[in-house]
Design a protein with these regions (language model features):
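Structural signature of tandem-repeat unit edges
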Residues: 2-16, 28-42, 52-63, 73-86, ...
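Short coil/turn segments at secondary-structure boundaries
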Residues: 47, 69, 91, 172, ...
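RING-type zinc-finger domain of E3 ubiquitin ligases
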Residues: 242-295
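Eukaryote-specific detector of the first structured module of a protein
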Residues: 17, 22-25
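Short, conserved catalytic or adaptor-binding loops enriched in Gly and charged residues
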Residues: 3, 25-28, 229-231, 255
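Consensus positions within tandem repeat domains that build extended binding/scaffold surfaces
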Residues: 45-47, 67-69, 89-91, 112-114, ...
């Protein structure tokens, strides 16, 4: 079977690759892409380890089960399509030139240290992703901002530990985390935002994050990690139709509309949330009545 087409390595759909190492292992040739056809399975190890390729595409429903299949490669971009299953440990470990990773919806990553030590700068995770195992993105030092999508599920340890330049994490809605030390030693981390219906179990998930100052959460937030101390906001979001007619934001001196993000303080006043958030960071009283709002 001819696997090299137009300077790309192309694996046909529904292939089953059992061979370890093989002809492409640490090849000196430079390829445009490694394209794994949909519903293919890899059980061999280090099949494409050390290969120089601009991009790796893993198509829908693939199962990558071997050890280090793409590890130590020189690729810049990885795209993993929906319903793929990355089971094998060290699958992309030490791809130090890697710039962006896009994982589409409903993928499962369960191999230990799948992306550890990679040069990832842009990480896009799809809805419904499931992550298991140890150190999935351990020591990916170039990630600065991270978004965890809606309906994500994590049952893992040291998942993003030692991502030392990570500054902010924003969780979507309906996210469940069972973990230990998931974000430990992320020493640049400053802000974490949890969406609605987020649940956290385990402990030490944000241990060793000395610069973490902002922790905000939405409705129905459940925190069972006793090492993560949450300071409740002195206000809550409300819908436009819930506020009295004619009320204005006294910080920005403007009327609300259907597109406004409105916050109501514990003392009953209404403000634009961004303006109130900035106020609360510097003050401990309501901008309207000066009532003390937090300790």
């Amino acid at each position: 079977m001819e696997l090299v087409q137009n300077n790309s390595i192309v694996i046909p759909p529904k292939s089953h690759i059992e061979q370890s190492y093989g002809p492409f292992y640490s090849s000196q040739d430079i390829y445009d892409e490694i394209n794994i056809g949909s519903e293919s399975t890899f059980t061999g190890s280090y099949t494409f380890a050390g290969v120089q390729s601009e991009k790796i595409t893993i198509n829908r429903g693939c199962n990558i089960a071997g050890f280090g299949v793409f590890s130590r490669g020189f690729c810049r971009n990885i795209e993993i399509h929906s319903d793929a299953n990355i089971v094998g440990p060290y699958s992309f470990q030490y791809c130090s030139y890697l710039n962006s990773v896009q994982v589409h919806e409903n993928c499962r990553i369960s191999g230990n240290h799948t992306f550890s030590g990679c040069g990832i700068r842009e990480l896009h995770l799809g809805r419904g992703i499931k992550v298991f195992g140890t150190g999935t993105f351990y020591q990916c030092e170039n990630i600065e901002h991270l978004e965890i999508p809606d309906n994500a599920f994590f049952d893992s340890i040291f998942t993003f530990a030692k991502c030392v330049n990570l500054k902010s994490v924003r969780f979507g809605n309906n996210v469940i985390l069972y973990g230990h030390s998931m974000f430990s030693s992320c020493e640049s981390l400053e802000a974490v935002y949890f969406g609605d219906n987020v649940s956290i179990y385990g402990e030490d998930n944000f241990n060793g994050c000395p610069n973490l100052r902002i922790i905000e959460h939405g409705a129905n937030f459940l925190n069972e990690d006793k090492t993560l101390r949450i300071f409740e906001k002195p206000y809550k979001r409300v819908r436009f139709e819930e506020i009295p007619e004619g009320v204005e934001c006294s910080i920005r001196m403007e009327s609300f509309d259907e597109n406004s993000v409105i916050a109501q303080t514990t003392c009953g006043h209404y403000f634009n949330e961004d303006g109130l958030r900035n106020w609360v960071r510097q003050n401990d009283t309501c901008p309207m009545c000066r009532k003390k709002m937090k300790c």
